[in-house]
């Protein structure tokens, strides 16, 4: 006799692709992290929409199978230090090479596939565990970080997961009692049969989405656009702010971001100008910091707003402005939840502003880091976006 298994109870039991899809997602996540420096520092994606697609290489997965050796004296055993996905016995079975960028090789390579992901998907893999540090509850909260769903009454139509079982039973009992009263009023003594559930008994929870408000936050993005910031430095600075702005907009709703560029004079610019306009001239770091504080004074009262400052420069400041810059940074720290200062390619550490800020700005909400190449972008940003600053 044939036996048919009912998969309607748990339709995922026979879906053999679930594990494959999970493994594929893990491979995509690993590939994004391994190629992060190249992805986020690719200048062509700066300022692009979140739906723009980029390609990343993913190492292929092979089915398990037995492989015949080449009759060598060695065996294809591991050394004990292998990791998941490594090919065992590869080095022992020959001295061939794959030929990766340095001449032709004679060994079989790995299967590498390219998959397309959107910019939004890239950052969704990476930004889940990051938060604005020291985010305080302020008056007149406006930031919506999530939408909480709350039950708000009942309705006659809905989806099965929202079926209100208790309310449905009550409606059925009410219908039964109404029928009994009607029969009694008619003077009939007929035995009342048990009524089954009907569509008119069904009641579903009405769900109302309620915005979950937390705190106000204003982000000051300040970038040094002086003549000493060559194309490489500006490219790294823009990449840093591109990742930062994507994080802010994906993690928080209605957050305010101000973009400030400066040489000897600081001014607020549009986001497009910030990422694409080229400037020159000397460097007064204090001008950028003072412009940020002027904007805060005009639009963002620290009593009701969480203030964050992110400043990127090569640290090459005009000497007469050093003292003013240190003074401005101290003032900024007094009103801000956190200030992150990233210095790009310091050619002489003892003469740059990072060295001076580290020595004269002792506030706990001040974080300084160095960006020497594109591989440093992600670690520096992670350092600044810890949830709570250490005491």
Swiss-Prot record:
Compositional bias per record (Gly residues), positions renumbered to this chain: 96-106
Region (Disordered): 1-20, 75-109
Family label: Belongs to the UPF0229 family.
Name of the protein this chain belongs to: UPF0229 protein CA_C0580
Species of the source: Clostridium acetobutylicum (strain ATCC 824 / DSM 792 / JCM 1419 / IAM 19013 / LMG 5710 / NBRC 13948 / NRRL B-527 / VKM B-1787 / 2291 / W)
Higher taxonomy: Bacteria, Bacillati, Bacillota, Clostridia, Eubacteriales
């Amino acid at each position: 006799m044939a036996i048919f298994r009912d998969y309607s109870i748990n339709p995922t039991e026979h879906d053999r692709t679930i594990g494959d899809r999970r493994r594929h997602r893990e491979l995509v996540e690993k590939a994004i992290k391994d190629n992060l420096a190249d992805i986020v520092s690719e200048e062509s994606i700066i300022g692009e929409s979140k739906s723009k697609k980029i390609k990343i290489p993913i190492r292929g997965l092979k089915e398990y199978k037995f492989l015949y050796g080449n009759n060598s004296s060695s065996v294809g055993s591991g050394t004990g230090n292998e990791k998941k996905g490594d090919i065992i016995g590869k080095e022992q079975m020959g001295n061939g090479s794959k030929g990766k960028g340095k001449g032709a090789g004679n060994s079989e390579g790995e299967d590498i596939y390219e998959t397309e992901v959107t910019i939004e998907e890239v950052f969704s893999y990476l930004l889940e565990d990051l938060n604005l540090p020291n985010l305080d509850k302020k008056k007149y909260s406006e930031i919506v970080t999530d939408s909480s769903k709350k039950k708000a009454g009942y309705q006659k139509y809905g989806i099965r997961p929202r079926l209100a079982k208790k309310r449905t039973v009550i409606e059925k009992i009410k219908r039964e009692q109404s029928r009994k009263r009607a029969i009694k009023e008619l003077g009939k003594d007929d035995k009342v049969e048990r009524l089954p559930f009907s569509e008119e008994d069904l009641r579903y929870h009405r769900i109302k989405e309620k915005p979950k408000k937390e705190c106000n936050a204003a982000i000051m993005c300040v970038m040094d656009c002086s003549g000493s910031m060559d194309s490489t430095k500006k490219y790294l600075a823009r990449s840093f702010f591109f990742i930062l702005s994507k994080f802010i907009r994906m993690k928080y709703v209605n957050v305010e971001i101000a973009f400030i560029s400066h040489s000897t004079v600081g001014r607020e610019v549009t986001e497009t100008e910030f990422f694409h306009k080229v400037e020159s001239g000397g460097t007064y770091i204090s001008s950028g910091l003072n412009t940020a504080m002027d904007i805060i004074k005009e639009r963002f009262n620290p009593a009701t707003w969480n203030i964050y400052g992110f400043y990127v420069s090569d640290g090459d400041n005009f000497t007469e402005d050093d003292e003013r810059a240190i003074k401005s940074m101290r003032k900024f720290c007094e009103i801000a939840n956190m200030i992150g200062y990233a210095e790009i390619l310091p050619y002489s550490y003892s003469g740059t502003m990072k060295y001076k800020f580290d020595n004269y700005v002792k506030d706990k909400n001040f974080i300084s880091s160095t960006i020497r190449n594109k591989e440093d972008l992600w670690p520096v940003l992670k350092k600044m976006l810890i949830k709570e600053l250490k005491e």
